[in-house]
Design a protein with these regions (language model features):
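A short linear-motif detector with a strong N-terminal bias
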Residues: 78, 119-126, 143-144, 172-176, ...
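Juxtamembrane and targeting peptides
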Residues: 2-87
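Exposed beta-sheet edge and beta->alpha loop/turn motif
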Residues: 1-25, 42, 149-217
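A short, amphipathic edge element
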Residues: 131-153
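Core segments of small alpha/beta cavity-forming domains
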Residues: 56-136
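A broad structural signal for short, well-ordered beta-strand segments within beta-sheet-rich domains
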Residues: 45, 142-143, 206
């Protein structure tokens, strides 16, 4: 969902905070906490945000990574059924949202197969963002279950015991910081998610994934 997001400012796709606004007036602006009087970096400010010594803007305390709860896999998602595959795919989306909001990709890694393109691309981009920034307010909502069906090994080239799960939903990239630039993408966008969920070693794991926006459909 966020594959090119962190490169947006550098490429000129989105304006940084303080430049010509592109966000609707109804969008809630990012919180801008004042620095502590005892802070050694209180003189270093950018757009109302305090700058820490490494040059990155300070993340608002009320949106700290610690305010996000790590997702838990539902018990029914541990069952070798189509419903189990569906719930495991929804959990996967929860772990991806958690990764963007916290920088912790481990739950997402645990539910996806190493080497798979969707998995590796998102892990790379989350790590790149948190090497020089942060994000909060990222969220994904499933609005419709399009299909949950067994996937043919012959037709799709998938592994045995694979269920294809397709969701319609919305995604919101929230507020991100890249270095000293704030990127406000706090708006819902319609998307379609598709996952190959494979039953392996006693549990569901994603062996393929994709997300399409309206322009890509």
């Amino acid at each position: 969902v966020f594959a090119v997001y962190i490169n947006g400012v550098a490429e000129g796709w989105w304006h940084a905070w303080g430049e010509k606004p592109t966000v609707a007036a109804t969008t809630t602006p990012a919180a801008r906490p004042a620095p502590s009087a005892s802070s050694p970096t209180e003189a270093a400010m950018s757009g109302g945000y305090q700058i820490v010594p490494d040059g990155v803007l300070v993340r608002p305390t009320e949106h700290a990574a610690s305010t996000y709860t790590k997702p838990e896999l539902p018990e029914e998602a541990k069952e070798n059924t189509e419903r189990g595959a569906e719930l495991a795919a929804e959990y996967l989306l929860d772990t991806l949202t958690y990764a963007w909001n916290t920088g912790d990709t481990q739950p997402f890694e645990d539910i996806t197969q190493p080497g798979e393109k969707f998995r590796e691309g998102h892990i790379k981009n989350v790590n790149a963002l948190y090497a020089n920034g942060w994000m909060y307010g990222n969220k994904t909502t499933v609005t419709n279950i399009v299909s949950v069906l067994p996937a043919s090994e012959k037709e799709w080239g998938v592994e045995p015991n694979t269920i294809a799960v397709v969701f319609d939903g919305t995604t919101n990239n929230g507020i991100a910081c890249v270095g000293q630039k704030i990127i406000d993408k706090n708006s819902d966008e319609p998307v379609t998610y598709a996952f190959f969920m494979t039953w392996k070693n006693g549990g569901w794991i994603s062996t393929g994934g994709s997300v399409l926006n309206n322009e890509q459909k």
